[in-house]
Swiss-Prot record:
Keyword Hydrolase: yes
Required cofactor names: a divalent metal cation
Catalytic reaction annotation: dTTP + H2O = dTMP + diphosphate + H(+); UTP + H2O = UMP + diphosphate + H(+)
Record-given protein name: dTTP/UTP pyrophosphatase
Annotated site, Important for substrate specificity, chain positions: R11, T71, Q155
GO cellular component terms attached to this protein's record: cytoplasm
Keyword Cytoplasm: yes
Family the UniProt entry places it in: Belongs to the Maf family. YhdE subfamily.
Entries under HAMAP family matching the protein: Maf
GO molecular function, one term: UTP diphosphatase activity
Protein location: Cytoplasm
Organism of this sequence: Clostridium novyi (strain NT)
Keywords noted in UniProt: Cytoplasm, Hydrolase, Nucleotide metabolism
Length: 191
């Protein structure tokens, strides 16, 4: 059966290749602003992932498995998405400096054959070292943080700020492979 990843993220594509040899990429046009945050990060990311999977699946005319995913950083009860500009990135990184934050990913796996959908979320806690303003500005000048939730990439230069991680590393990168693999098994998807 065809597998479709509803994401433009190169990181997710690279991770998915570890468990699936052949898949298509169809970028979701889902309007994330239609999902309102109700205070529960886990539910929020699952709804975002579900919306992405469903927006791609509606146009698929054959049997397929569609994977939607969304990742956020949560700190002090707030969602830290991708930074709007360099000042926003600086403020995010300054807030995370010396503190623990949580990374949530929602996964939605939709089987178009029977319209069965499974959604789950994964949470990983990450502790940052204390970062000087100079180091934050130097990191921002690389442009790496500009397309990443929480303004850092653990798999890139931003990984040097990570002092400790409790949970799934791949979740912080953007696709919790272990949970996705389990969902496939529970849904009877043969890889």
């Amino acid at each position: 059966m065809k597998v479709i990843l509803a994401s433009a993220s190169e990181r997710r594509q690279e991770l998915l290749k570890r468990i699936i040899d052949d898949f298509e990429i169809i970028v979701s046009d889902f309007d994330e602003s239609t999902v309102k945050f109700n205070g529960d990060f886990s539910v929020y990311v699952q709804e975002l992932a579900k919306g992405k999977a469903e927006s791609v699946a509606k146009d698929i005319k054959e049997d397929a498995i569609v994977i939607g995913c969304d990742t956020i950083v949560a700190f002090n009860g707030k969602v830290l998405g991708k930074p709007k500009d360099e000042t926003h990135a600086f403020n995010m990184l300054k807030a995370l400096s010396g503190n623990v934050h949580s990374v949530y990913s929602g996964i939605a796996v939709l089987d178009t054959k029977n319209n069965n959908i499974s959604t789950e979320s994964v949470c990983t806690n990450v502790k940052f070292s204390t970062i000087t303003n100079e180091k934050i500005n130097k990191y921002i000048s690389t442009k790496e943080p500009m397309d990443k939730a929480g303004a850092y990439g653990i798999q890139g230069l931003g990984g040097v700020f990570v002092e400790e991680i409790n949970g799934d590393y791949y979740n912080v990168v953007g696709l919790p492979l272990n949970r996705l693999y389990k969902i496939f098994g529970d849904m009877g998807v043969n890889l």
